[in-house]
Amino acid sequence: LSLVGSEMCIRDRGGYHEREIEEYGKKRILQILSMKDRIAVFAIMNVVDRHLQKRYIRTTGASIKRRGTHDLMNRIRTDLQKDPEGTLYAYKFDICRFYDNVRQDFVMWCFRRVFKDERLLVLLERFVTLLPEGISFGLRSSQGAGNLLLSVFLDHYLKDKYGVRYYYRYCDDGLVLGKSKAELWKIRDVIHGQMEKIDLEIKPNERVFPVEEGIDFLGYVIRPNYVRLRKRIKQKFARKMHEVKSRKRRRELIASFYGMT
């Protein structure tokens, strides 16, 4: 009950402020809740996420406990090494302004397929409808909402209906491996069709290319025999190290960098 009372202020008093950040060259607006609301959202989503994670395919990695970029990158490398003939080509895509363009009614439809408790659904709807359109980039619940939406309308559709063997997703970035360009262009058309159903679009920078060029994904350039960090990540690290004077912050940056390597 105390959590329910706490969550009321998210909508009733507009209890958040906004801050602009820059991430991977993109400017984003974060909605930041009061500490009281953040604790409430975190507690509720800890329970919700445990139920959602059982429904995700194994090759999606964003904001999922015991997964992440390393886990997904290693799975891609393993598949490249185990089936070189079946992974000669790659199709890489990115959903256009995903959080901004997500339809709130589709997200709630997905939540209602999983949860039947009306009190919980009322809270989830408050999280989802924090903004007039889209879902909040900064809200803890949006990670689960986005993953669930794409799990229902894309991940399981590709894996279960079309039997796509080598498909990987990290948030709104996707990768498919295949034995031919023709195979991947067909899968590309299926992905576009699914995104149109939920009013989302794939960015025009999508491409099909030979794996031997290297797969620029998850902050790495991935090849069957080796992986290296993306060049601009190394440049960003060097720039930050030059700018930061605090010894403690330098140690944090170094730990973060070596965590990626």
Segments from the language model and where they lie:
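Single conserved hydrophobic/aromatic residue that forms the stacking wall/gate
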Residues: 1-5, 10
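Inter-domain linker/hinge segments that demarcate the starts of reverse transcriptase
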Residues: 7, 187-198
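Short, conserved non-catalytic motifs in the polymerase core
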Residues: 14-41, 55-67, 127-148
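Short Gly/Ser/Thr- and Asp/Glu-enriched loop/turn motifs at secondary-structure junctions
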Residues: 14-16, 168-172, 204-205
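Right-hand nucleic-acid polymerase module
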Residues: 33, 38, 42, 127-130, ...
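Active-site-proximal segment of RNA-dependent polymerases
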Residues: 41, 45-103
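Active-site palm subdomain of RNA-directed nucleic acid polymerases
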Residues: 44-58, 113-124, 143-190
